[in-house]
Amino acid sequence: MLTKDLSKKILKSDVDVENSVPDEPITMELLKGGSFLKRAIGICKRNLTRMNMIRLMKILRDSWIWVPCRVIMSDTDYAAMEKLVKDAQENGGLDSLVGITLSNQDNIRMIPDILQKGDEFFFPVFSSAEEMCEYGERFSKIEKHFLEAANLARNNEKNVKGIVINAFTEPFVIPSELFEMIAGMPSNFGKNRSV
C-alpha cells in the first residue's frame, strides 16, 4: 500500500516528465531535425495511451525520417569509382576528392536494410541521421517521407512486422497494421505538402 509520503515523492519525481504527446499545431519547423518526433516517441514509450499513439501517428504522417540503404552499382560504375579513388591516393590523397561530382553510367540502386529479431523482420528508420550511431556508418543514408518508408516496408520481400524507429537508441515499433491508418490521416500541410 502506498503511504501519503511515498505518493508525494512519486508525484514530485514526475514533475518534469512529459506524459502526453504535445497536441500543438504541427509545422515544418517543428518537425525539422527530428527532435520533436524523438520527443513524441519517448513520451509514448513512457506512457502508451490511445491518445498519445494517435498524436504520434499524426506527427508521423508529415515526418521525414532517415533510411539506411546499401548502394548497389554496376560493375562499370564500381570500376570507375575504384579508379578515381586509386588515382586520388597516388596523386595527393583522398582529400582531393572533396567537392568532386561523380556521374554514373548505369542505374544505382538503393536497397533499404531490414533488421531481424528471431523470426520477425523490421524496417529500420531514424528520426535523424545521428540516431543511426555506428550502425549508420556501414550504409548510405537517405531522407524519406514516413509514408514512402511505409510503402517500402509494406512492399518488401520479407514479411515486415513493422517499422522500428531509432532501433539503437530508444526503439519504438509502428506495427504494419497501422500504415494504412497513418496514410489515411489528413496532412497538417494541405494537399500541396503531402506525399
Can you say where each PLM-predicted feature lies in the sequence?
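An interfacial alpha-helical scaffold signature
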Residues: M1-V195
